[in-house]
């Protein structure tokens, strides 16, 4: 039985046709994918033909030129605004701005696009975009380089960046040429400067400006793609601090202070001296003045070959001639002498400076002590008179004793016995109320004689009298009852002027004749019965008159020059017979003490 073609529908049902042939959305959902594609395309084609066929109205073309000029004007205003704000963006920013447009603007732009053909719009806009992009790209690259350099200088690694740039330009580290000064207030006469980003005009002009302030100027400038750097070696006429030099050079070279590196030069490094010497030979280097001594000394062939060895005896002789017996004083002063003394320079080059200083101080103390002990009291006083400088008058001492109602002849007679160390006359005590000038008088006399001051606060130590072994006179200032009791108990023979045994630390006890002793006190030892055994050993002078004015200052001052005039004036009255004067009159010549090895061919 053959199959019938067409649709089978029941004629009894009047609406069966609609149920069979009508298209419904539910039917599309049940269809397979792609089943109705051809049908939809075909239907669209017929619809478009029908639409074009039915729409015969004329299209309004509009004013193309006016719209184009409006768009160009708007684009020009946007470019001008971007230039004024200095925010010329890259192509990425421009693409981002296009992507951020609102849907309304896109629809509006799509409507206007109908006025132009697609190819015509591309032909007009493409050349402008290419030319503007190339110019903006070149400008942005230069601006990026400048911005990157500025950021590096301002960053926390600015010092690392500047040191790296200096080393890449000069093939030498900045720290190899300089030594470190941590404090900006520390002054120095010579400075090394590294200036970054300096202009050629200011670099050349700085030489003429620095000639007035520097005795030596050496400057050189180098450049490469990473930046520009100039190095200066300046020897100022006066010492300047880093802060002063920074302000001076920043204003002179018209650069930021962050673009400067400043440190004093390394004057003891051979590599640093060779760097400056080699740079001075370059035609690109600008110079003014002669090379510093430390560069010539290290680069001259004669000086480099004739390096002297350190002579310890020469150092001891120098310290003895200057009467330096303290270790710190010797070390400091001998280091300062290195600029003019070759042996001092050799001393600084040794690895045993502390040992040499300690041994030198020990030897000088031995020599000075032996020299002092070998002199008689008149010869010793004459030596002290030679050390006193200035003009003085013995009348100031006379006026002071007259003010205290003490006859000067009485003091002269007591001082004569005191200087000669006569037993029972070896101690002078100045008694009186406070502020009467007792300490002023005794301290000035002890200072002139170069004596020793004893502090009773250290009496519990076995070594508080150790300084008497090297002293020609001693002073105990402001003795109290405890001090007088100690004298009465332990130091009667010292007050008498007889030999005593002195205990010295880490050394054997030494026996010496007790030196003359001065004592100041507010206690009248002659009126105290408890110190009966000291009455015959101490000769007292009473000071009753106060020595202060209304403002609390002392109107009397006695200096070393006054004591020098006093001893010269009363030399005969004090029985100071100098045996050395008699020997000089007999024709004996005095020779300076020598404690260093001299040339054996020299004439003695």
From Swiss-Prot:
This is Replication protein E1. It is an enzyme of class 5 (isomerase). A motif (Nuclear localization signal) lies at residues 84-86. ATP-dependent DNA 3'-5' helicase required for initiation of viral DNA replication. It forms a complex with the viral E2 protein. The E1-E2 complex binds to the replication origin which contains binding sites for both proteins. During the initial step, a dimer of E1 interacts with a dimer of protein E2 leading to a complex that binds the viral origin of replication with high specificity. Then, a second dimer of E1 displaces the E2 dimer in an ATP-dependent manner to form the E1 tetramer. Keywords: ATP-binding, DNA replication, DNA-binding, Early protein, Helicase, Host nucleus, Hydrolase, Isomerase, Isopeptide bond, Nucleotide-binding, Phosphoprotein, Ubl conjugation. Phosphorylated. Sumoylated. It catalyses: Couples ATP hydrolysis with the unwinding of duplex DNA by translocating in the 3'-5' direction; ATP + H2O = ADP + phosphate + H(+). It comes from Bos taurus papillomavirus 2. Residues 141-307 are annotated as: DNA-binding region. Residues 24-48, 90-112, 581-604 are annotated as: Disordered.
């Amino acid at each position: 039985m053959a199959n019938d073609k067409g649709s089978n529908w029941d004629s009894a049902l009047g609406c069966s046709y609609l149920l069979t042939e009508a298209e419904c959305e539910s039917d599309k959902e049940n269809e397979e994918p792609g089943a109705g594609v051809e049908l939809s395309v075909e239907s669209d084609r017929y619809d478009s033909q029908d639409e074009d066929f039915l729409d015969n109205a004329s299209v309004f073309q509009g004013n193309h030129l006016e719209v184009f000029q409006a768009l160009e004007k708007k684009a020009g205003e946007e470019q001008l605004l971007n230039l004024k704000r200095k925010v010329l963006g890259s192509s990425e920013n421009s693409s981002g701005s296009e992507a951020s447009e609102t849907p309304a603007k896109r629809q509006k732009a799509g409507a206007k696009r109908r006025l132009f053909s697609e190819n015509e719009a591309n032909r007009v806009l493409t050349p402008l975009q290419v030319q503007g992009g190339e110019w903006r790209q070149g400008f942005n690259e230069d601006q990026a380089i400048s911005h990157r350099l500025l950021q590096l200088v301002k960053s926390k690694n600015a010092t690392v960046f500047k040191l790296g740039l200096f080393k890449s330009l000069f093939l030498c580290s900045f720290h190899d040429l300089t030594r470190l000064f941590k404090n900006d207030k520390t002054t120095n006469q010579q400075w090394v400067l590294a200036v970054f980003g300096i202009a050629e005009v200011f670099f050349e002009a700085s030489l003429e400006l620095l000639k007035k302030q520097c005795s030596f100027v050496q400057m050189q400038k180098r450049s490469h793609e990473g930046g520009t750097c100039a190095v200066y070696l300046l020897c100022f006429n006066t010492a300047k601090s880093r802060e002063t030099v920074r302000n001076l050079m920043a204003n002179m070279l018209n650069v930021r202070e962050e673009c400067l590196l400043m440190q004093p030069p390394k004057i003891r490094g051979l590599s640093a001296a060779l760097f400056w010497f080699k740079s001075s030979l370059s035609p690109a280097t600008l110079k003014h003045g002669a090379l510093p001594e430390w560069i010539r000394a290290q680069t001259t062939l004669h000086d480099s070959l004739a390096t002297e060895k350190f002579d310890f005896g020469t150092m001891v002789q120098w310290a003895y001639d200057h009467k330096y017996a303290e270790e710190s004083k010797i070390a400091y002063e001998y280091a300062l002498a290195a600029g003019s003394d070759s042996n001092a320079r050799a001393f600084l080059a040794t690895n045993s400076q502390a040992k040499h200083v300690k041994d030198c101080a020990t030897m000088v103390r031995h020599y000075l002590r032996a020299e002092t002990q070998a002199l008689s009291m008149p010869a010793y006083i004459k030596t002290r008179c030679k050390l006193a400088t200035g003009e003085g008058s013995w009348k100031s001492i006379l006026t002071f004793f007259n003010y205290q109602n003490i006859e000067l002849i009485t003091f002269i007679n007591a001082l004569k016995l005191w200087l000669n160390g006569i037993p029972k006359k070896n101690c002078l005590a100045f008694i009186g109320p406070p502020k009467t000038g007792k300490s002023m008088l005794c301290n000035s006399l002890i200072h002139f004689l170069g004596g020793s001051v004893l502090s009773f606060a250290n009496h519990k130590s076995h070594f508080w009298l150790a300084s008497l072994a090297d002293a020609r006179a001693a002073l105990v200032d402001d003795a109290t009852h405890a001090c007088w009791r100690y004298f009465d108990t332990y130091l009667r023979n010292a007050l008498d002027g007889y030999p005593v045994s002195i205990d010295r630390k880490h050394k054997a006890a030494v026996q010496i004749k007790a030196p003359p002793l001065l004592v100041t006190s507010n206690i009248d030892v002659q009126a105290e019965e408890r110190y009966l055994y000291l009455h015959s050993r101490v000769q007292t002078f009473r000071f009753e008159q106060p020595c202060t004015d209304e403002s609390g200052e002392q109107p009397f001052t006695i200096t070393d020059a006054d004591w020098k005039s006093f001893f010269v004036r009363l030399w005969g009255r004090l029985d100071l017979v100098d045996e050395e004067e008699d020997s000089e009159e007999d024709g004996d010549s005095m020779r300076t003490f020598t404690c260093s090895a001299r040339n054996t061919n020299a004439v003695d």
